[in-house]
A protein has these predicted regions:
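Conserved PRPP/pyrophosphate-binding segment of the phosphoribosyltransferase/PRPP-pathway fold
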Residues: 1-124, 131-168
Length: 168
């Protein structure tokens, strides 16, 4: 998973402010994400999408932070992100769980494909990656919906993900 930032120190503070306090900094984070993804995956994707939040969380916050990131990144590529996923279950926040197994179980069956990605190479965007289980599940759903390939990028990786060497 490509990422411009490690989720620690000032980057962590900025991302938490962005995520939970009105989306401040979306343009900056989106620009960092766009540059990183373009450098890592140049020519490897046909369209970009994002990991969606649940309808309840979107109503509570007033926005979907990862959609904001995707829109900001795509503006720099002079395109629009495509909504390909829907969160159908309002599961507990991944950050409330410990360990990859618990996080994996928490996201199984939580997402459905809602857009056409048949034969497309998809760039899947997220805000924070800890174990990669959410991205893995979303990538699985997109592949089952016909995506030719799925590559991933996030605004930040936790040190745990950085050190794991796993792929989505």
């Amino acid at each position: 998973c490509a990422s411009p930032l490690w989720y620690e120190d000032l980057a962590r503070e900025g991302i938490l402010r962005f995520k939970f306090h009105g989306g401040a900094g979306a343009e900056v984070l989106g620009a960092l994400l766009a540059d990183c993804a373009a450098e890592r995956y140049s020519g490897e994707f046909d369209l970009a999408t994002w990991v969606p939040v649940s309808k309840r969380r979107r109503r509570k916050r007033g926005y979907d932070q990862t959609e904001l990131l995707a829109r900001s990144a795509c503006r720099l590529w002079e395109t629009e992100p495509v909504r390909l996923l829907q969160k159908v279950t309002d599961n507990p926040a991944q950050s409330s769980l410990q360990g990859a197994a618990a996080r994996r179980a928490n996201v199984l069956g939580v997402y459905d494909a809602v857009g056409d990605c048949a034969g497309k190479r998809v760039l899947l965007l997220d805000d924070i990656v800890t174990t990669g289980e959410t991205l893995r599940e979303c990538a699985r759903v997109l592949r089952e919906a016909g995506a030719a390939d799925v590559v991933c990028a996030a605004a930040a990786l936790t040190p745990l993900e950085r050190d794991s060497g796993k792929k989505a």
